[in-house]
């Protein structure tokens, strides 16, 4: 097939555009699903809990009162970081699990 002097090799532009629109719609649905999801990470046997959104934004941080009694500041900071990393890791895993479901355009 030639268009304006270019050989498109039988490429169906209409089908390609329809497939691109379908991929865009699926990507938007996946992004919405992530935006509505929350992921909780824990550290120190549950002494510290962090909740992040599907986009990785920290939404909540809970520190058990006993963590304040029995833990020095440096250890507590390490537990907070570990809980946040746990939660963001779960969000990232969900993001990656949704992306392979996206069809390719077959170019």
UniProtKB/Swiss-Prot annotation:
Which sequence ranges form a coiled-coil region, renumbered to this chain? Answer: none
InterPro entries under this entry? YbaB-like_sf, YbaB/EbfC
Query: What keywords are assigned to this protein?
Result: Cytoplasm, DNA-binding
Look up keyword Cytoplasm and say if it applies. Answer: yes
| Protein family per UniProt | Belongs to the YbaB/EbfC family.
GO CC field: bacterial nucleoid; cytosol
Subcellular location, record wording: Cytoplasm, Nucleoid
What task does this protein carry out? Binds to DNA and alters its conformation. May be involved in regulation of gene expression, nucleoid organization and DNA protection.
Q: How does it assemble?
A: Homodimer.
Organism, scientific name: Cutibacterium acnes (strain DSM 16379 / KPA171202) (Propionibacterium acnes)
Q: Which GO terms describe its molecular function?
A: DNA binding
Does the keyword Methyltransferase belong to this entry?
A: no
Q: Output this protein's name.
A: Nucleoid-associated protein PPA0205
């Amino acid at each position: 097939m030639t268009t304006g002097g270019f050989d498109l090799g039988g490429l169906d532009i209409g089908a390609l555009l329809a497939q691109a629109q379908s991929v865009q719609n699926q990507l938007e649905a996946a992004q919405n699903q992530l935006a509505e999801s929350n992921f909780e990470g824990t550290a120190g046997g549950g002494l510290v809990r962090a909740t992040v959104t599907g986009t990785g934004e920290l939404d909540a941080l809970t520190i058990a009162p006993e963590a304040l009694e029995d833990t020095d500041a440096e250890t507590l900071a390490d537990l907070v970081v570990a809980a946040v990393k746990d939660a963001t890791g779960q969000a990232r895993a969900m993001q990656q699990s949704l992306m392979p479901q996206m069809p390719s355009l077959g170019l």
